Amino acid sequence: MINDIKWVQAQRKATDWRQAVEIATRPLVAYGAAQPCYVNGIIENTLNWGPYYLIAPGIALPHARPEQGANYNQVSITTLRTPVAFGNEECDPVWLLLCVSATDANAHILTIQRISQFIDSPQRLTAVGNASTDDALFALVSG
């Protein structure tokens, strides 16, 4: 799902959902998959509509609309050292953020399908949560 270690971040520290989103989007912005305004789009959308991207207990899929700053299709994966609350009783606290930059609806759907297959394995998720370094996390999510 991830083809380069630059897209993974293991055991990062965030104090709240906003900081978690900012951290999770850093690779997307740093390597050009998204513009800085994309981060603001996710935060503004969350403030307006709530955390619409929480997909399972502990798992968030932060993303904004393509026109909010997506440059090309990419996923970044971030695990948090200490899970944070996003304000959703069913999914809080969140420890895994799969941040998506998608340029159109078709790309978004294909990415969601790949992520669904990825998170379908409890054993894989446990290993991802236990990965203590970027290298260890990349070994689990590459391919």
Curated annotation (Swiss-Prot):
Gene3D superfamilies: Mannitol-specific EII, Chain A (3.40.930.10). The phosphoenolpyruvate-dependent sugar phosphotransferase system (sugar PTS), a major carbohydrate active -transport system, catalyzes the phosphorylation of incoming sugar substrates concomitantly with their translocation across the cell membrane. InterPro entries: Ascorbate-PTS_EIIA_comp (IPR051351), PTrfase/Anion_transptr (IPR016152), PTS_EIIA_type-2_dom (IPR002178). One of its GO terms (molecular function) is kinase activity. GO terms for biological process: carbohydrate transport; phosphoenolpyruvate-dependent sugar phosphotransferase system; sorbitol transmembrane transport. The keyword Kinase applies. It holds the Pfam family PTS_EIIA_2. Keywords: Cytoplasm, Kinase, Phosphotransferase system, Sugar transport, Transferase, Transport. Signal peptide: none annotated. Residues 1-143 form the PTS EIIA type-2 domain. This is Putative phosphotransferase IIA component SgcA. The lineage of its organism: Bacteria, Pseudomonadati, Pseudomonadota, Gammaproteobacteria, Enterobacterales. One of its GO terms (cellular component) is transmembrane transporter complex. The EIIA domain is phosphorylated by phospho-HPr on a histidyl residue. Then, it transfers the phosphoryl group to the EIIB domain. It is found in: Cytoplasm. PANTHER family: ASCORBATE-SPECIFIC PTS SYSTEM EIIA COMPONENT, PHOSPHOTRANSFERASE IIA COMPONENT SGCA-RELATED.
